Amino acid sequence: MIRLSPGFAINPRFRSDSFVNSQKPPFLSVQIGSQRRNLSRIGSENGDGVAFDAVAYEADRLSLDAAAMEDMAETAKKELESDPDSDPKAWKWVIRKKMWDLMEARNYAMSPRPVHHRIPNFVGASAAARKLAELDAFRMAMVVKVNPDSPQKQIRFLTLSGEKKLLTPQPRLRTGFFSVLESDLLKPETIMEACTSVGVAKYGRAIGLDEKIKVDLIVIGSVAVNPQTGARLGKGEGFAELEYGMLRYMGAIDDSTPVVTTVHDCQLVDDIPLEKLAIHDVPVDIICTPTRVIFTNTPIPKPQGIYWDKLSPEKLRQIRILRELKNRLEKKTGRKLPTGPSEKLPPTAERKRR
């Protein structure tokens, strides 16, 4: 079923033209690690006399992202070479590669490019964001969780400019968990910067697993999504699923919390088999493209938390907040939680052997 929603009025206090020729505001202080104590300082200092170095932070982030994408490219190569009958994830990589290739070939992709191994930015992302902002679910929401990827940047802006609280994960959950940004604590000229990774680090308040917060709407990025079922594929790292599972653990969301994605119309597919989805795969309730809004009425159950038997040792080592949660649960229950299979695949010849 496809329905279009009524118009949306943005708070004039945060109009986009308020950023034109605006002076750079003083940077808000944030706590940073000791490894950056010798970096050049910009802006104000925190209580330890250490300033946030935006240039160093962004360089570090881009370097780590590049390494992660290189790892994912290698994983994708191995998965695509594997036997689809014996590898439960190979089919997902076939769809991802087709979509990334299509978006590049037809020039639907936008910077950063190439879009391979990313949540792809796309032509019309801002129009899709405006469609999302017209939803009653967005209008009524007080707290909106939005992924940190490029095509959802305008949604982060509309969230803050709509005087809502923005919850966004720290990049790849490397340095922590989620950050909260509140428009009341931001100057109009800082809103756009606050929608970037650097801005989240500058202006956001880091939260932990004990934070008492209710999330009213979840926005996630997608590589491909089925409009008939709400089945969705991300870029293959599983962060949307992990973030969802941890929010369930915190009691911040439940089955009724709407999950929305914004995509280009070309990202709507019909070849995501429901029977092959994993228990932790997050379906979407609503899809917003530049041209329409689709309510999926998804029949797919939403994950109920973290499925530790599906979580690889590599992912656990990579994400500190997951280790903290696992240790907490094991201490509370007095029993060791299971760990999933390794992400390392056997050699190509062995994978293709029947």
Swiss-Prot record:
Main location: plastid
Transmembrane parts of this sequence: none
Matches recorded under InterPro entries: FTHF_cligase, FTHF_cligase-like_sf, NagB/RpiA_transferase-like
Protein residues bound to substrate: E134, K235, G236, E237, G238, F239
Residues reported to bind ATP: 60-73, 234-243, 281
Gene3D superfamilies xrefs: NagB/RpiA/CoA transferase-like
GO molecular function, one term: ATP binding
Gene Ontology cellular component list: chloroplast; mitochondrion
Transit peptide feature, positions: 1-51
Keyword Plastid: yes
Domain of life according to the entry: Eukaryota
Location within or outside the cell: Plastid, Chloroplast
Region: Disordered, residue numbers: 330-354
UniProt KW keywords: ATP-binding, Chloroplast, Nucleotide-binding, Plastid, Transit peptide
Biological role: May be involved in thiamine metabolism. Does not possess 5-formyltetrahydrofolate cyclo-ligase activity in vitro.
Protein name as it appears in the record: 5-formyltetrahydrofolate cyclo-ligase-like protein COG0212
Organism name: Arabidopsis thaliana (Mouse-ear cress)
